């Protein structure tokens, strides 16, 4: 059996009025976003099941670096590990 790697996991995010993350929850702990390093968008597979995501690579108040994305169709947030 093949197990997918780096499957996105749902994550709780608080965004500002522009849609940029300002807080994320890792487990039960809230972390403040200190800096957004990179932002990019992926729009794909419109002919099947549309994918529209905005990704953020960011530094958090505990020193960790995480990548999250917002599904622009559903509005949900997920963490993507690399």
Show where each model-derived region lies.
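Non-catalytic peripheral regions of nucleotide-handling enzymes
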Residues: 1-82
